[in-house]
Every structure is written in structure tokens, then in C-alpha cells.
Amino acid sequence: AQDKDLYNRAEKMMREDLLFTNPDFNRKEFVQALYTNEHYLTRALKYYTGMSIQDYIVHYRIDYAHTCLLIPDARSIEEIALASGFSSVRSFNRNFSEVFGMTPHKYRKEHANKA
């Protein structure tokens, strides 16, 4: 029950407060924001998502960036990367490619062709 409550609080915080959009937001800050310790948060996230704390943060960043890429606006890949909480375009490209199997630029291009 304690893990479920902690997981629910983590989800709510990520969805509503968008803490992950700050490039400096990390495992330590997440633990502090939830008033818990790293052991409990690690256990809760592993149980409910199968992810580590850092992977969970990156998951939210990628999901947010993915949504931004689908919006046909003039924002550059760099602007989307930074708005999503990545500290560099290189880091964004690497993480995005691991999830989607292509760069954000290629993903955006392919999606635009389908529209």
C-alpha cells in the first residue's frame, strides 16, 4: 500500500507539475520532492513500471517530446529537446532513437508525410 501511494504521488507530480522539463531535475530532486528516500521510490517504480528512477524521468521527457513533435508548429528539434528537459540535443536524439528507432527529425518528417 505504501508503494502504491508513493507511485501514485510520483505519477501525479510528473503529470501535473512537469518537473521533468527542468534539465537539472534528477533522481535526488525527485526523491526530495516526494519526501521519501531513494530506496522506497526505486522499489515503487520498479514494481509498477519496471523502470529505474532515471529511466522513469527519461520516459516522461521522451513522451512529452513525442507529443511536441506531433504538433505541427515551427519549433525546432533543439527547442523541443530543451522544453522536454533534455540538457542537449545529442542526449535527446540518443534517447529518442532508443525508443522510436529513428531520430526526432526523421520521426517528425515521416509523421508530416502521413498528415
Regions found by a protein language model. Give the residues of each.
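Terminal helix-turn-helix DNA-binding modules in bacterial transcription factors
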Residues: 47-84, 110-115
